[in-house]
UniProtKB/Swiss-Prot annotation:
Basic and acidic residues: compositionally biased ranges: 491-500, 529-541
UniProt biased composition (Basic residues): 512-528
Protein known as: RNA replication protein
GO BP: any one term: mRNA modification
Catalyzed reactions per annotation: RNA(n) + a ribonucleoside 5'-triphosphate = RNA(n+1) + diphosphate; ATP + H2O = ADP + phosphate + H(+)
Species of the source: Potato virus X (strain HB) (PVX)
Length: 1456
């Protein structure tokens, strides 16, 4: 709906809008006419929203009133639904007014029958006299309906009705029963009805109207659960049925099913016959509620009423995150989470119980007291279950540890409005003796049994992950099966015993049985694997004892393999395991030995020598696999540390070898088997798939997928989320770059040719073209980039090449989305770089790389390469048989015609802009193989990961040329070294500064003003009026359902409470600010708006050009001035402290997208007088953090234009930029006219209103200054495509841009001169969005034609320029004595500092600000009115009492 609304709002033509409204009205009218029958009433906004949730529309212009309109509407709607179900033949209606047939749209010609019985006195007036009967008569129609009465009748009524009315087949009935009453909850639909509880019953009050209330007993609620009713024919009197068997008694059944349900109103269908009905009946539940466990004794001191789960989670996280959760803090947090309007729904006693419960949770330790399954050796793991069992028994006998208490205490019971249907069986129970409807209380024993149910906390103590259970543990479990079964104590028959049973004994008994069941199940499933591992252990021990040395014929363990970390070792086999016999019998041939065979004495000697070499190789059993990928592997190689390089590492033996799925081409299966890459079934992580699908659906990632319709994204995520699990056969192939991972597969594909159901998914288009060249005899659509594969579909066999470069979660999403996939083949290198997501708001950004997920399904890592020569490969820890020496050189010059590798994507773009199209990043060059590469080294290189560096260094086959672009060492670099990115975008040439400002000579000292005296004022005289109207904290705070109340009103001090304290960490205020200050759009709409307002931008620029006296011809570009401005910007940035530079590291990073913006909430105290003590807190201000290089570039552009602006600026125009109050005072005294009214101007949403027209103005201004075109275009790009985590921003100004102040000021000047006809010589002062003029100019006639096309709206304030009424500018008053701080604002700000106890820290600043007014002494009586004088006096007294600061005014002490 949001996108549809956005499209409609984009229409600006009034004729188009009129047509849309006319068409919408034609569509709306019949719909509203349809709903008018059931809902003709005027509804409250809240009730209308609830009704819309039930699919019932409300006419907003309806004026018909009703005491309980919403409840009556639902009643009417159910009658309408019933009318669509009833047959067009006579129906018997019971307890129904005949006029309500209108709501059913019944044909009045149908001879319907009415049976109404007066049960209550008011029924006499309710039903027409002719429909009232003394008792219910026989129903002679097939269908009947009972209206809102069945729940009051005895359950036997239905039996008697069907028994006495043989023709009746279907009975419809409406019930009014709020299911939440079963839990004694407040109404879940308070806008429709409310509930009150009295003893054993409750009252249903529709619309809070007591006249329409119903009283129910709790037993009535049983009616909502009935599913079937069975009874017998009466025989031999009341108890005659006892003499018959089940077969001898005639049985009758009716089936009850819920037809429709709205709030507390339900429509049931009761049909004669034994039919199917759902086992569980679910009613609408708008919110999720939970009940805390009953952990305190006596039980009365536990929370008994359901509480919103969100509230419970918020409170729980609060008490666990604060250092000390005091009682008052928890009460305050609860108060913060509850709206003031909802306080009457809570009981004070329940809140006390809740706070006590939360205090209990806060005092418990959250660190587990149980041992893990990862630590320790074989013996420790074997005894782990025994220790756990002992620990459990100890806790059962001696009491739970804190951690166990905490887990038990937060095991909240969900309050679910789903009920298991019941069968009421009257066959062998007399109807008159039916007593099954009174709810019974649980006994203590039953309650404790439920408390210690099998599905509780102890599951997490006794259940151990399958992958963490080792051989000895399972074998011990097998041996102890019989003992465990025999040791289980049988239950003692209960008989008639009702005495209290010790719950601890029941608890222990359940744990014992549970442990034995799980041990038996684990052991049975793993018996075969355990026996094999045990045999392997025994055999290895025997061989070690006999040989006394490591057996080189066995596969080395992970600990011996180079490049295997501790985590990897932990995920593979823990002991040595014998290799299959077929590997030991593998034959060996070596074509490289041909020359030696000619010299050797004979063939037998050659075989003996060869076999001797083979026998000494640690990887002799892996030779067939190495030979299959082209390696002889007869040489032992070592890395630079002297460690042996194993060509096969990271072996995983416990993977099952499975058959290839049906339809797998024989050539492909043969090649994979030769490499020992048989498939194994992998369960996919659907959470990763859902994260990827969510990002695609919400267009946070991708390029092609962003162009797809929203329905496709919904279908993608819906299909993924609908899967409970997804398993697929997979062959995972890991190997070093150039090891031949893809070669064997490409060979098989060439053999297969066309016609196969195979798809190859590639991470880049370059890799796709490479595969197309190497496998030319296949269909071109076999090779797809990953986004094309997701959109266009795949075959049943999918090959993912270089899958580490695919987005995390993509493989899981594709396989889950395409259910036809039955085999996947993954080729990649876990040592090389992985996919990096740059979108900050993408969910997959937080997922681990795919190689970490699938590495455990890879049988081995092929640590050998055909690409690099032996010397380079060995330095990288890789096995290689290529002879020769890799040429390595280094200089500061580039080689022509050689691919260039750079560390950052930004540098890649820059180099490609210079014509070097074969430039790649270190990470992006994966898959590239070239004879020569040149690698650029700069300050980003040192922050690249080892995986990325390995990727870059392994690209070349013959030569690597390093290019050092860094400068030589110097003391200057120490500060630049503070972050890894700073040097990459700062120029380090000698700065050529502009001419520095030379201050004017000091004016002669004026004659001092005569001193004066002002009367003592009441300390609270200024702020008292604001405090009188001060509301309660939570009435003023902004409330969000997601984050609770904001926290802007702080402390108990009423002075501090007047000021809104906006903090960056306030989530509620942040989102309120985002909603109020930021608008999202898309790049296309922004650019369209930019083009559509070109003519307005021209008008703005022409007015600005005339106002600022710019020459008519463009100003020639000055490279010298530009460089000087750039160095000024750079010097100002580097003048920051080293700590501040380090804090900006993220924005300095070349990986920070130049169009990305980080948005923060500005932390500040709001001291504006007009916002003191507002009844509702206003949204704050945002700060935007741009890419630092972008800020400095456009900051240079703004400073460059400022330099020329100041050169041409008229003297009557003053811009308060890099000036002092003394400068502004001198200018005002020289140029300001105080004899006429003046105008001060402010704006509504100034930043957000700077739309495409203002951008067009800025572009024209930049072009007039001859700014280079590429810089202007970059500025347009970032303004039309500024991206935050919510999407692309509309064209607007953001605090934090490089040219923010200058651009705001110049837009202000342009708008002011476009709107007003300002006489020549008028004094004007500007600074950002503030401005003031010394006259009140007329509005131009031409502006009325532009007003509606400009979003910017001004708020002019006219002052008379007399005592107490002077123009205000940036907090300064412009007076005939010069500028001075507004005394009221200064005093208000001072009182805040005093109330916070921070006056000593800022006293110097306040004294300086005060001095501009204080210097005028007696003249202040001519400038300030009474209130201003009061504020000025109180400020002076406060500063005197607090003591003088370092910049104190000595004359202040003589003032009073």
């Amino acid at each position: 709906m949001a996108k549809v609304r956005e499209v409609y709002q984009s229409f600006t033509d009034s004729t188009t809008k009129t047509l849309i409204q006319d068409e919408a009205y034609r569509n709306i009218r019949p719909i509203m006419e349809k709903h008018k029958l059931s809902n003709p009433y005027a509804q409250t906004v809240e009730a209308a929203n609830d009704l819309e949730g039930f699919g019932i529309a409300t006419n907003p212009y309806s004026i018909e009133l009703h005491t309980h309109a919403a409840a009556k509407t639902i009643e009417n709607k159910l009658l309408e639904v019933l009318g669509s179900l009833l047959p067009q033949e006579p129906v018997t209606f019971m307890f129904l007014k005949p006029r309500k047939l209108n709501f059913m749209r019944r044909n009045p010609r149908i001879k319907d029958i009415f049976h109404n019985v007066a049960i209550e006195p008011r029924d006499v007036a309710r039903y027409p006299k002719e429909t009232i009967i003394h008792k219910l008569a026989e129903i002679k129609t097939d269908t009947a309906y009972i209206s809102d009465t069945l729940h009051f009748l005895d359950p036997s009524y239905i039996v008697e009705t069907f028994q006495n009315c043989p023709k009746l087949q279907t009975l419809y009935a409406t019930l009014v029963l709020p299911v939440e009453a079963a839990f004694k909850m407040e109404s879940t639909h308070p806008n429709i009805y409310s509930l009150k509880y009295f003893g054993d019953g409750f009252q249903y009050i529709p619309g809070n109207h007591g006249g329409g209330a119903y009283h129910h007993e709790f037993s009535h609620l049983q009616s909502v659960k009935v599913g079937k009713i069975k009874w017998r024919d009466p025989k031999d009197g009341l108890l005659g049925h006892l003499n018959y068997t089940h077969e001898q008694v005639d049985t009758h059944t009716v089936t009850v099913q819920l037809q429709e349900s709205f709030a507390a109103n339900h429509l049931y269908c009761i049909r004669r016959g034994n039919m199917m009905t759902p086992e569980v009946r679910t009613f609408g539940q708008p919110d999720r509620y939970v009940l805390p466990p009953q952990i305190f004794l006596p039980k009365v001191h536990n929370c008994k009423k359901p509480i919103l789960k969100k509230t419970m989670m918020q409170l729980f996280l609060y008490v666990r995150t604060v250092k000390v959760a005091k009682n008052c803090d928890i009460f305050a947090k609860i108060r913060q989470l509850i709206k003031s309007s909802d306080l009457d729904k809570f009981s004070a006693v329940e809140l006390v119980y809740l706070v006590s419960y939360m205090e209990f949770l806060a005092a418990l330790q959250a660190t587990t007291c149980f041992s893990d399954t990862l630590s320790g050796g074989l013996l420790t793991k074997t005894l782990a279950p025994v220790r756990a069992w002992i620990q459990e028994k100890k806790m059962q006998l001696c009491g739970l540890e804190d951690y166990a208490k905490l887990v038990k205490a937060v095991d909240w019971r969900p309050v679910d409005f789903s009920f298991k249907v019941e069968t009421w069986d009257f066959r062998f129970n007399p109807l008159g003796m039916w007593k099954a409807f009174q709810p019974s209380e649980l006994s203590d024993v039953e309650e404790m049994n439920n408390f210690f149910d099998d599905g509780d906390l102890l599951d997490c103590f006794t259940r151990m992950p399958a992958y963490a259970v080792n051989a000895e543990e399972d074998l011990a479990g097998m041996r102890g099966d019989n003992q465990g079964e025999t040791s289980t104590a049988p239950r003692e028959p209960e008989g008639d015993k009702k005495e209290y049973v010790n719950p601890a004994e029941t608890f222990l008994d359940k744990l014992t049985r549970k442990h034995n069941r799980e041990t038996k199940s684990r052991a049975a499933k793993k018996a075969k694997r355990l026996a094999e591992i045990q045999d392997s252990i025994n055999r290895d021990q025997t061989e070690e004892e006999s040989q006394g040395a490591p057996n080189m014929g066995e596969a080395p363990s992970n600990a011996e393999l180079p490049g295997t970390n501790g985590a990897g070792a932990g995920t593979t086999f823990p002991t040595l395991k014998a290799l299959p016999q077929k590997w030991e019998d593998a034959s060996f041939t070596d074509s490289s030995m041909t020359d030696q065979m000619e010299i050797m004495p004979g063939k037998e000697a050659v075989e003996v020598a060869t076999q001797k070499v083979v026998d000494e190789l640690p990887w002799k059993h892996w030779l067939p696999q190495l030979n299959a990928v082209g390696f002889k592997a007869l040489e032992i190689q070592r890395d630079r540390n002297g460690t042996m390089i194993m060509p096969i590492t990271e072996m995983v033996f416990e993977l099952d070898k499975e058959e290839f799925p049906e339809g797998t081409p024989e050539a492909l299966a043969r090649e994979l088997k030769a490499m020992n890459r048989s498939p194994t079934t992998i369960p996919l992580d659907l959470l990763r798939a859902r994260d990827y699908g969510s990002d695609v659906k919400n267009k946070r990632i991708g390029a092609i997928t962003k162009t797809q319709a929203a329905s496709w994204g919904e279908y993608l995520t819906g299909k993924i989320e609908s899967l409970p699990e997804r398993k697929v056969a997979a062959c995972v192939i890991h190997g070093a770059g150039g090891s031949g991972k893809s070669h064997a597969i490409q060979k098989a594909l060439r053999e297969i040719g066309k016609g196969s159901d195979i798809t190859v998914v590639l991470p880049t288009n370059e890799l796709r073209l490479d595969w197309s060249k190497k496998v030319p005899n296949t269909e071109p659509y076999m090779f797809k980039t990953y986004e094309k594969a997701l959109i266009g579909g795949t075959g049943s066999i999918v090959i993912f090449d270089d899958y580490s470069k695919l987005p995390p979660g993509y493989i899981e999403a594709l396989v889950s989305f395409s259910t036809k996939i039955k085999l996947i083949i993954l080729t990649g290198d876990s040592r090389q770089s992985v996919y990096h997501e740059t979108s900050d708001d993408a969910s997959i950004r937080h997922l681990g790389p795919a190689t970490e997920v699938f590495a455990k399904y890879c049988r081995y890592y092929l640590n050998a390469t055909h690409r690099n020569k032996k010397d380079l490969a060995n330095m990288l820890g890789v096995y290689s048989e290529r002879t020769g020496t890799t040429e390595i050189s280094m200089s500061s010059e580039f080689l022509e015609g050689v691919p260039t590798l750079v560390p950052s994507d930004e540098k890649r773009k820059l180099y490609m802009g210079t014509g070097r199209n074969d430039t790649f990043t270190y990470a992006g060059c994966q898959g590239l193989t070239k004879p020569k590469v040149q690698i650029v080294l700069d300050h980003n290189t040192q922050v690249c990961s080892a995986n990325v560096m390995y990727t870059a260094l392994s690209r070349a086959t013959d030569r690597i040329h390093f290019i050092n672009t860094s400068a030589n060492s110097s003391a200057f670099w120490e500060k630049l070294d503070s972050t890894p990115y700073l040097k990459t975008f700062l120029s380090v040439v000698r700065e050529q500064a502009l001419r520095e400002y030379e201050p004017v000579e000091a004016e002669p000292i004026r004659e001092p003003e005569p001193q004066t005296h002002m009367c003592v004022e009441n300390e609270e005289s200024v702020l008292e009026e604001y405090k009188e109207e001060l509301l309660e904290k939570f009435d003023r705070e902004i409330h969000s359902e997601a984050h609770g109340h904001s926290n802007c009103v702080q402390t108990e001090d009423t002075t501090v409470q007047l000021f809104s304290h906006q903090q960056a960490k306030d989530e509620t205020l942040l989102w309120a600010t985002i909603d109020a200050r930021l608008k999202t759009s898309n790049q296309e709409s922004n650019f369209r708006e930019f083009l559509s307002k070109r003519d307005i931008g021209d008008v703005l620029f022409l007015n600005y050009q005339r106002a600022m006296g710019l020459p008519k011809e463009p100003i020639p570009f000055s490279q010298e001035v530009w460089e000087a401005c750039a160095h000024e910007v750079q010097s100002k940035y580097l003048s920051k402290s080293k700590c501040n530079l380090i804090n900006g590291t993220v924005r300095q990073s070349p990986d920070f997208d130049e169009n990305k913006i980080m948005v923060f909430l500005k932390s500040q105290w709001v001291t504006k007088v007009e916002k003191l003590g507002l009844p509702k807190i206003k949204p704050g201000q945002t700060i935007a953090a741009f890419y630092q290089q972008t800020v400095m570039l456009f900051g240079t552009m703004a400073r460059y234009m400022r330099w020329f602006r100041q050169a041409f600026q008229p003297k009557e125009v003053f811009i308060n930029c890099e000036t002092t109050p003394e400068d502004m005072s001198a200018w005002a005294l020289s140029n300001w006219n105080f004899t006429r009214p003046s105008l001060a101007n402010d704006y509504t949403a100034f930043d957000q209103s700077q739309d495409g027209a203002m951008l067009q103005f800025e572009v024209l201004k930049a072009k007039h200054h001859c700014i280079p075109e590429e810089i202007i275009q970059a500025y347009i790009d970032i303004k039309t495509n500024a991206q935050i985590f919510l999407g692309t921003l509309s064209i607007m100004r953001l605090t934090g841009e490089g040219p923010t102040f200058d651009a705001n000021t110049e837009c202000n000047i342009a708008f002011t001169h476009t709107k007003f006809d300002i006489p020549a010589g008028t004094a004007q002062v500007y600074a950002g969005d503030d401005s003031a003029l010394d006259c009140v100019p007329e509005i131009k006639q031409s502006f009325h034609r532009l007003e509606d096309k400009l979003l910017l709206k001004s708020k002019p304030v006219i002052t008379q320029q007399k005592k107490g009424s002077w123009p205000e500018f940036c907090g300064w008053l412009i007076t005939p004595k010069g500028v001075m701080k507004d005394p009221i604002k200064l005093h208000v700000s001072l009182k805040l500092a005093e109330a916070k106890g921070e006056l000593k820290k800022c006293q110097d600043s306040y004294e300086i600000d005060l001095s501009y007014a204080y210097d005028h002494k007696d003249s202040l009586h001519d400038l300030f009115d009474e209130k201003q004088c009061q504020a000025h006096t109180l400020t002076c007294r406060t500063l005197i009492k607090s003591g003088r600061g370092t910049v104190s005014l000595p004359r202040l002490r003589n003032f009073l």
